[in-house]
């Protein structure tokens, strides 16, 4: 084993970091110690994970994550369509002036309100009802699904919880949901278009994605497969 790789694996931070990466977590600069470890040993750990037919990716924004190949020895799972949509709204908010005005802090309710404004509400209601328009109870069900999505996205490193009152900061890792609009003239406008059009564009994902809001059955599970794949774990 190369000396520098042995040094990386011997680091007391590595076992928990390795487990987090295999569970689908994205490690951004907010996670100072783990991010510094990945920066220092990026080449060696990249070689380490290639043994599992998995790539250690460093995104242009600086965050790290694992991307399994089709023959990977590390499991993979998928995010639901509503998870993907919530992720895209988080990316939109990350790009917004409101993030600076709020010192980067948002609440679950603010995210939900923004989702209702940006996306087609009739299509959103298909996540919880077969009716063309939703009742107040349906809105409550949709809000519960959004909160569940936020918990999933928190576990994979897309946001950082602040206290116990449903407040959070958005991590730079949310660019996983908006990578293909980075080079546009107005990335925020392009991200808004993706949300309204129901497009799911994901960083370096080879297969084309199906619509976020069209072509799915409305049931109570909310687990509709999407092609943004994450490693095995509670995604």
UniProtKB/Swiss-Prot annotation:
Stretches for region Disordered: 204-235
One Pfam entry name: MukE
Organism domain of life: Bacteria
Keyword line: Cell cycle, Cell division, Chromosome partition, Cytoplasm, DNA condensation
Primary location recorded for the protein, binned into one broad class: cytoplasm
Subunit structure: Interacts, and probably forms a ternary complex, with MukF and MukB. The complex formation is stimulated by calcium or magnesium.
Protein name per Swiss-Prot or TrEMBL: Chromosome partition protein MukE
Lineage: Bacteria, Pseudomonadati, Pseudomonadota, Gammaproteobacteria, Vibrionales
Name of the encoding gene: mukE
């Amino acid at each position: 084993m190369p000396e520098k790789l042995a040094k990386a694996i011997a680091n007391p931070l590595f076992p928990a970091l390795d487990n987090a990466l295999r569970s689908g977590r994205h490690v951004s600069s907010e996670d100072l110690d783990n991010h510094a470890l990945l920066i220092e040993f990026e080449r060696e750990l990249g070689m380490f994970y290639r043994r599992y037919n998995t790539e250690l990716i460093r995104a242009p924004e600086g965050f790290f994550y694992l991307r399994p190949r089709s023959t990977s020895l590390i499991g993979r799972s998928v995010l639901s369509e509503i998870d993907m949509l919530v992720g895209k709204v988080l990316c939109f908010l990350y790009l917004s002036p409101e993030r600076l005005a709020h010192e980067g802090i948002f609440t679950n309710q603010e995210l939900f309100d923004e989702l209702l404004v940006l996306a087609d509400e009739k299509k959103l209601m298909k996540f919880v009802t077969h009716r063309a328009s939703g009742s107040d109870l349906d809105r409550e069900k949709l809000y519960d699904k959004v909160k569940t999505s936020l918990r999933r996205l928190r576990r994979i490193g897309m946001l950082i919880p602040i206290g116990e009152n449903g407040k959070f900061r958005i991590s730079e890792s949310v660019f996983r949901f908006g990578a293909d609009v980075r080079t546009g003239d107005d990335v925020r406008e392009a991200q808004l278009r993706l949300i309204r059009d129901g497009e799911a564009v994901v960083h370096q994902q080879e297969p084309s994605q199906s619509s976020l809001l069209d072509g799915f059955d409305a049931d109570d599970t909310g687990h509709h497969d999407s092609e943004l794949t994450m490693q095995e774990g509670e995604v």
